[in-house]
Amino acid sequence: MKAIKVNAGRTAAVQPARMPKLRDGYLLCKVHCVALNPADWKYLDFIGVQGVTLGADLSGVVEEIDPSCGAHFEKGDRIAAFVHGGNVSQPDDGAFAEYCLVKADLALKVPDAMSDEDAATLGVAVATCGQALYQGLELPLPGGAPYDGFLLVYGGSTSTGTLAIQYARLSGCKVIATASPHNWPLLKELGVEETFDYKDPDCAKKVRGIPICKAGYLTDGALIRAFTSDSLVLALDCIAEGDSAKICEDSISESKGGTICYLFQAKHSRADIVDKRVFAYTVFGEAFDKFGQSWPARAEDFARGKEFAALASQMLSDGQLRPHPVRLGKDGLEGVLDGLQQLRERKVSGAKLVYRVVETP
């Protein structure tokens, strides 16, 4: 089979690869489509351990099932999944391949009406939303007692952002979001209360409800506070770079404080704000090394991830979740390499790059 492997010098190429060997609790998936995430190129450029397979998001069909998986899946079932690409402990686990192992308890069942291309956008975003919204920010699960308050989603037009907006609204939140103005119509379709341009120097104060003086300039992030009348206590930062942490911090109520959940490492300066960091790879419940740190196995994260995957599969079947918009690339796995460069150059906004593996030359 073929896969995208990391070579010496932190480069990557499509090359022959061994078929993954089935492990306890895993399915063997024939990969139909893969989707790209910023973590893919960042891992390659900043760590890039030779010999590992890249990629985290996929859709495909079940080819083989480990007996320990139970009766949840059958051969031929369509699935979407988040897999641990760039994993030195299991170097063949990446999504950018013709075949890939998928942890059965975390796999999503794909409805008949959903395309493989749309399904490929779901895996990472579903797992991340589960950890960020329901473990980190402790929102009630959809169907429970609703949360009666605002949630800020910074980076609302990312794949995680659009799904977080939908989940949060189903949990009762009044969602506000930051995004580039050209992506505002998408967020409005998803039901956000208001959108804010993260490049606006007054962004956070407009959210919190601070009067905006037309003469002179206010601090960065100053717009969000106005809309919430200084009541915002929960924020999800899907970007965690540039000014995102500062804008989220400035948006949080000065009278109440609050909690910010970051998808990557970030810092704030306010003592009345609690940090929560999400690192979605812990959802597998397995120890690993990544980005210069050793991460122990987290049984609780796996248990919660299993519960959330089952809920997500049901919600997808019921038509409650809308996949992120797709930008379909060409040339299969070879095209993925070009897609990684597009992500490096910040050329993709409001859509997810997806590639059909069968189109690999």
From Swiss-Prot:
E.C. no: 1.-.-.-
Pathway the protein takes part in: Secondary metabolite biosynthesis
What InterPro entries does this protein's entry cite?
ADH-like_N (IPR013154), GroES-like_sf (IPR011032), NAD(P)-bd_dom_sf (IPR036291), PKS_ER (IPR020843), Trans-enoyl_RdTase-like (IPR047122)
Give UniProt keywords alphabetically: NADP, Nucleotide-binding, Oxidoreductase
Among its keywords, does the record have Oxidoreductase? Answer: yes
Residues bound to substrate: V124, A125, V126, A127, T128, C129, G130, Q131, A280, Y281, T282, V283, F284
Q: Which positions in this protein are listed as binding NADP(+)?
A: 39-42, 157-160, 180-183, 198, 260-261, 348-349
May I ask which residue range the UniProt record assigns to the signal sequence? none
- The membrane-spanning stretches of this chain are none
What domain of life does the UniProt record list for this protein's source?
Eukaryota
- Any Pfam family from its record, for instance, is ADH_N
Q: Does the entry feature the keyword Oxidoreductase, yes or no?
A: yes
* GO MF annotation list: nucleotide binding; oxidoreductase activity, acting on NAD(P)H
PANTHER family given for it?
HYPOTHETICAL OXIDOREDUCTASE (EUROFUNG), ZINC-TYPE ALCOHOL DEHYDROGENASE-LIKE PROTEIN C2E1P3.01
Q: What's this chain's function?
A: Oxidoreductase; part of the hps1-dma1 gene cluster that probably mediates the biosynthesis a derivative of cyclopiazonic acid (CPA). The hybrid polyketide synthase-nonribosomal peptide synthetase (PKS-NRPS) nps1 might incorporates acetyl-CoA, malonyl-CoA, and tryptophan (Trp) and utilizes a C-terminal redox-incompetent reductase domain to make and release the tryptophan tetramic acid, cyclo-acetoacetyl-L-tryptophan (c-AATrp), as the first intermediate in the pathway.
Family, as annotated = Belongs to the zinc-containing alcohol dehydrogenase family.
Assembly description: Monomer.
Protein name per UniProt: Hps1-dma1 cluster oxidoreductase toxD
Organism per entry:
Dothistroma septosporum (strain NZE10 / CBS 128990)
> Gene name?
toxD
